[in-house]
Amino acid sequence: MKTAIITGASAGIGMELARVLAKAGHPLILVARSEEKLSALKNELEKKHRVSVDYLVKDLSEKNACQEIFDAVQLKKIEIDILINNAGFGDFSDFANADWEKLNQMIQLNITALTHLTKLFLPQMIAKRYGRIMNVASVAAFQPGPYMAVYFATKAYVLSFSEALSGELKETGVSISTLCPGPTESNFMEVSNMSESAFIKGKKFPSSLSVAEYGYKSMMQGKTVAIHGTGNYFLANLNRFVPRKWVVGITSKLMRKAT
């Protein structure tokens, strides 16, 4: 069975992806900052699904973390067949008043770490003519996002980067899928403070498990862009239905702080 490495595996969509892949029989390497959560998840998955689960405690916003992860995997002589770049976070704030350190950390995690891990693991996949890569973006990738300007921009990068790579990887045996969920019931809302936005407050959203199941199926089928949910598909294609200059206004109304 193909071995997978999953970043941001200690909560939300990442944790559910770990559960979905373990259920399918994949040996796993889990990456996140919390050893306590990773250890608990390892014990759960090994007991329930009888698969091999290892983990690495790393903060991917730190400069050398990606190389250290790659080196640790090489030292264990584990071949990675599936790379899931799930780690990321957002911040609900107008740009002028946002904390620069948090924004910089977001860029490092959402863009730099994802790109670096892909660069490190991709050559081996190409060499053996098999690999599956899932980069987790968002429906936010398809339009600018006032009050979460940097987050939306990082996800636009993930989508553009992944689609470009999919063009390079044709006939290599390696496929790259971009998972684009909308708002999801997870800890993302709390971490980003997004629960205060008009679009989110008081509403119910899909579970992390439903997103993870859809993402895994789409990745294994080699789907290039996987948008979860009919409503999210409409939002992702908003530019097709209305002039682009209107899109910022519509998104601004959706994203502003609820009154």
Name each model-derived stretch.
Residues 138:
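Residue(s) in the substrate-gating loop at a strand-loop-helix junction
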Residues 86-91:
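Conserved NAD(P)H cofactor-binding loop of Rossmann-fold oxidoreductase domains
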Residues 68-71, 93-97, 101-108:
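Active-site Tyr-X3-Lys motif and surrounding loop/helix of classical short-chain dehydrogenase/reductase
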Residues 24-40:
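Conserved glycine-rich Rossmann-like NAD(P)H-binding loop of the short-chain dehydrogenase/reductase
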Residues 118, 154:
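Active-site helix of classical SDR
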Residues 10-12:
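Conserved glycine-rich cofactor-binding loop
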Residues 178, 199-236:
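C-terminal helical subdomain
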